[in-house]
Amino acid sequence: MRILLTNDDGIYSNGLRAAVKALSELGEVYVVAPLFQRSASGRAMTLHRPIRAKRVDVPGARIAYGIDGTPTDCVIFAIARFGSFDLAVSGINLGENLSTEITVSGTASAAIEASTHGIPSIAVSLEVDWKKTLGEGEGVDFSVSAHFLRRIAGAVLERGLPEGVDMLNVNVPSDATEDTKMAITRLARKRYSPTVEERIDPKGNPYYWIVGRLVQDFEPGTDAYALKVERKVSVTPINIDMTARVDFEKLKNVLFGESLQTGRTY
């Protein structure tokens, strides 16, 4: 089996190293990851300049490249360079990736990119103190999250994903053990309420930080509720077709004030 591994924390992240060790038991692991921290880069691609690749020694990997680009760049580079894969994994991320805000996450977006190429994909994230989310994982124990990654990846490689599921978004609580239960969940509506804080520089000019206020109330059945309230491993099936499952007649009535039942064509 050929497995692509990437992340958004960078190729030197301890979370990526833990993922290599877990996945190497299942197949050949090809690592293509950003050379530097690229959290919150979403599904951005580098189109305005060339990207450069550097061979990096990653124990347990079949081959490893660091890319001076985004996580999505890494997936595109890997497929162009090495062909398709049986599975793509993004992680293990420092910090959870929950709710519809996974579209901001470089971790989740890399898995989404791989799934657009027809590759079953998994994004896996470990809940950690926010102060550790921009480091390389020093002092963080990834063993339990690696256990769940190996377990879930093995199941996907053996049985595939159900029809209509393109990727799995997995979040592991910081206090999880190998006996922690898993929950199949849906995305919460929101995890953060973003706003802007103003500061003044030494010359008296304003500058701004985008900051997120945590949302505390989550509906049962969501990924945020499973992780934050039930302390379970959340597994959310994702379909990259974001078309709303709505009766088109109702939307036509909103847009045009009439339905097809009147005989009117649109």
Curated annotation (Swiss-Prot):
Disulfide bonds: none annotated. NCBIfam families: PRK00346.2-1 (NF001491), surE (TIGR00087). SUPFAM superfamilies: SurE-like. GO terms for cellular component: cytoplasm. This is 5'-nucleotidase SurE. The keyword Secreted does not apply. Keywords: Cytoplasm, Hydrolase, Metal-binding, Nucleotide-binding. Its cofactor is a divalent metal cation. GO terms for molecular function: 5'-nucleotidase activity; metal ion binding; nucleotide binding. The keyword Nucleotide-binding applies. Its EC number is 3.1.3.5. It is found in: Cytoplasm. Its main location: cytoplasm. A divalent metal cation binds at residues 8-9, 39, 93. It comes from Thermococcus gammatolerans (strain DSM 15229 / JCM 11827 / EJ3). The gene is surE. It catalyses: a ribonucleoside 5'-phosphate + H2O = a ribonucleoside + phosphate. Binds 1 divalent metal cation per subunit.
